[in-house]
């Protein structure tokens, strides 16, 4: 079973979301997602300042196996991207919940968080796959 940190929220598309002290949210892909994709070779990051809606594809993770869209779990403005992934995309594999984050978003509608999964619900989703 993949590591599923209890303090995070999750999407059904295998993104995770963590609220930061400044009110923004950090987004990445789950350990389960990176295991399915395999070794990352490139991450196409979104543009800082871009406005996205929940469910929009806003980044791409390219691995030795496939390219997979990364979706915005909530609507808002992209306020930062993980530039370290340009030189070290493998951080998505080795540190999916820490150094391998993809982007930070300032949510425009926090009620959308209610549609995300908690760790227990995400673990149940993984068991059903």
Swiss-Prot record:
GO BP terms: glycine decarboxylation via glycine cleavage system
InterPro entries the UniProt entry points to: 2-oxoA_DH_lipoyl-BS (IPR003016), Biotin_lipoyl (IPR000089), GCV_H (IPR002930), GCV_H/Fam206 (IPR033753), GCV_H_sub (IPR017453), Single_hybrid_motif (IPR011053)
PROSITE patterns: BIOTINYL_LIPOYL (PS50968), LIPOYL (PS00189)
Cellular-component GO terms for this entry: cytosol; glycine cleavage complex
Residue span, Lipoyl-binding domain: 24-106
Cofactor note (record): Binds 1 lipoyl cofactor covalently.
Disulfide bonds: none
Cofactor list: (R)-lipoate
N6-lipoyllysine: residues bearing it: 65
Keywords annotated in UniProt: Lipoyl
Coiled coil, from the record: none
Binding partners and assembly: The glycine cleavage system is composed of four proteins: P, T, L and H.
HAMAP family registered for this protein in UniProt: GcvH
Protein family: Belongs to the GcvH family.
Protein task: The glycine cleavage system catalyzes the degradation of glycine. The H protein shuttles the methylamine group of glycine from the P protein to the T protein.
Protein name stated in the entry: Glycine cleavage system H protein
Top-level taxonomy: Bacteria, Pseudomonadati, Pseudomonadota, Gammaproteobacteria, Enterobacterales
């Amino acid at each position: 079973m993949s590591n599923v940190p209890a303090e995070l929220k999750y999407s059904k598309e295998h993104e995770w979301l963590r609220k930061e002290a400044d009110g923004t949210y950090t987004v990445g892909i789950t350990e389960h997602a990176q295991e399915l994709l395999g070794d990352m070779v490139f991450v196409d990051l979104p543009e800082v300042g871009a406005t996205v809606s929940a469910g929009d594809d806003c980044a791409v993770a390219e691995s030795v196996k496939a390219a997979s869209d990364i979706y915005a779990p909530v609507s808002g403005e992209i306020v930062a991207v993980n530039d370290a992934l340009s030189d070290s995309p493998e951080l998505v594999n080795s540190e999916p919940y820490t150094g391998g984050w993809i982007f930070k978003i300032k949510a425009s509608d926090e009620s959308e968080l209610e549609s995300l999964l908690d760790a227990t619900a995400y673990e149940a989703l993984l068991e059903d796959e």
